[in-house]
C-alpha cells in the first residue's frame, strides 16, 4: 500500500454545479459562484469543468491571468472564437487556446438538434504563450496514453483502456502534482477507486510513478501533470 503519496479525491456527485439557460457545467474546482475550501486550484490547474451545451447555444468567458485553455470534446464537436481565430474542434482532438490576462473566448454548439459535452481545462502560466495549438489522438488505439497538451510547465494525456489492463505513468518532475480525471468507466489509480467523472489529485508521489488499472472495458482516463 502506498502510504507516502498524498491524495485528494474529487467525487463526481460532490462537484459544483451551475446551469444558465442552455449551458450546464459541473466544476471539479471553484468556479463562478461555486466555492468550497477544499476545491481550490491544484497548482497551475485552475479549472476543470464538465460542460454541456444545447443545440445552437453559446457562451463566453474571460481569463484574469495568462492562461492555456484546453477544449476537449467528448460528445460532438464545438466552435470556438477568439480575437485571433474562429474554428471547429471535434471528438478526437484538443484545442489549446493561449490567452493573456483580460482576453475572452467564445464556445458555440453548431448543431441544430444535438447536445454536446466537452471538458474545459484552464492552466495558468507565468507568461502567455499566445500560440494556439491543435492536438489529435486516436482512442481506437487502446491501452496507450496520448499527449494532448505540452508546455514548459504542464503536460496532459488521454487514453482508452481494456478492462483489467494495468499501466503506469512516470512523472516528469517529482516536485509536480498529477490530477487524474475519469472520463468514462472505472479505474483504480494509486490504490484509489475512481468512477466516471471522479477526479484525484496526487502530490509527493511515491517512486515518481502513477500506477493505474482499468476495471471496465473501454474506460477513458485523463491525466495532467502540473506545477504546484
Predicted regions and their residues:
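Hydrophobic transmembrane alpha-helices and immediately adjacent juxtamembrane helices
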Residues: 1-10
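Structural motif
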Residues: 77, 184-186, 218
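Conserved short histidine dyad/triad with adjacent acidic residue
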Residues: 9-37, 44-65, 74-102, 154-174, ...
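Short beta-strand segments
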Residues: 48-49, 73, 122, 183
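Ligand-binding loop in jelly-roll beta-barrel domains
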Residues: 84-86, 99-129, 152, 204-228
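Conserved, well-structured core segments that form or line functional sites
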Residues: 113-189, 196
